Amino acid sequence: GLIRASVTVQDKDNQRFAALGAGKRAVVVGGAGRMGQWLIRFLTDQGYEAGSLDPATALDERGWAHDALPSADLVICSAPPAATAELYAQWTSAPPAGVVADIASIKTPLIEPIRALQHAGARVASFHPMFGPSAVLLRDCDVVICDTGDAEATGTIEKLFQSTTVHVVHLPLAEHDRIMADVLSLAHATAIAFALALPDTKHVVRSTTLHALETLAANIVRESPDVYYEIQALNPYSMAALQRMRGALDRVVDAIASRNAEGFRALLHEGRTRTPGT
């Protein structure tokens, strides 16, 4: 409504007023993807001259980005972790002069490449926007900024969000994936499993609970399969989270199959201790 639109305009006005990127250049590697396009718009609002280095980008823009990359003030990799790791390995021979950062959802495959690039003299940061490319209002969104040991590079990324209403969360680089196994892997897998368990034919009546879960699951299963597979498969902590989900479902099934009303009540009580109160 009006409040949402007002806050959105205020965010953009604050970014332009701050003019953080005025006179600076930024290259987004993988900028033709949906999140890459979001980053280019975001950086442009900050005053940066920003362009995409991506095979799917128009030739003129791609050429500009290719030429700008070695001396650009900021280089953000909006590519899958494996592709970003490969780029970092290539750049160790001649690191970009500006701050290099990734937005990967999984950090484990990047830890060694980040260290190698730093050893080669690069300034490297790492962050993770906890929202998708359709996000307009950042007030209810989180951005995780990982500590790479380079305070200057990390500060550059933090300043990008200072003029917005986003909530910045700092995490050690090595802790990121352990936490994301709960925040992403568990949540996504639960939504996917719910979608797969739905009947083939729709019922004429729906509960508010079903509607809420259907809406959540519908959003998840329409995201990029490749990205969501990487979130599960490349995170070394994912399987432990998924085993917890399987164990929890088994406990529910066991309580019902054994007609254990007290056990079922205990499950709901335990669930209340793990979820926010209303």
What are these regions (language model features)?
Residues 1-27, 32, 44-49:
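N-terminal hydrophobic or amphipathic helices and topogenic motifs
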Residues 28-29, 77, 145:
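Hydrophobic Val/Ile/Leu positions in short beta-strands of Rossmann-like dinucleotide-binding domains
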Residues 170-278:
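An accessory alpha-helical subdomain
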Residues 33-34, 82:
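Residue-level detector of alpha-helix initiation sites
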Residues 37-38, 44-63:
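NAD(P)-binding Rossmann-fold cofactor-contacting core
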Residues 106-167, 171, 177-180:
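Rossmann-fold dinucleotide-binding core
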Residues 32, 55-56, 149:
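Residues in the short beta-alpha loop(s) of Rossmann-like NAD(P)-binding domains
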Residues 66-70, 74-117:
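Rossmann-fold NAD(P) dinucleotide-binding segment
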